[in-house]
């Protein structure tokens, strides 16, 4: 499965962002997390 990279739209309830990224609940896109 392809993951979602930086600034890609996402669904916080079904987070498909890449490793080290998290779906931001407010902005609805993948943000980098340390």
Curated annotation (Swiss-Prot):
Free-text function comment from the UniProt entry: Voltage-gated sodium channel Nav1.7/SCN9A inhibitor.
Family: Belongs to the neurotoxin 10 (Hwtx-1) family. 22 (Htx-4) subfamily.
Main location: secreted
Protein name: Mu-theraphotoxin-CCy1b
Entry's Gene Ontology cellular component terms: extracellular region
S-S bonds: 3-18, 10-23, 17-30
Source organism per UniProt: Chromatopelma cyaneopubescens
Subcellular location: Secreted
GO molecular function: ion channel inhibitor activity; sodium channel regulator activity; toxin activity
Pfam short name (any one): Toxin_12
Domain of life where this protein originates: Eukaryota
Keyword field: Disulfide bond, Ion channel impairing toxin, Knottin, Neurotoxin, Secreted, Toxin, Voltage-gated sodium channel impairing toxin
SUPFAM superfamilies from the UniProt entry: omega toxin-like
Coiled coil: none
Tissues expressing this chain: Expressed by the venom gland.
């Amino acid at each position: 499965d392809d993951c979602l990279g930086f600034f890609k739209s996402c669904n916080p309830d079904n987070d498909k962002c890449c490793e080290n990224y998290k779906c931001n609940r407010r902005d609805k896109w993948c943000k980098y997390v340390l």
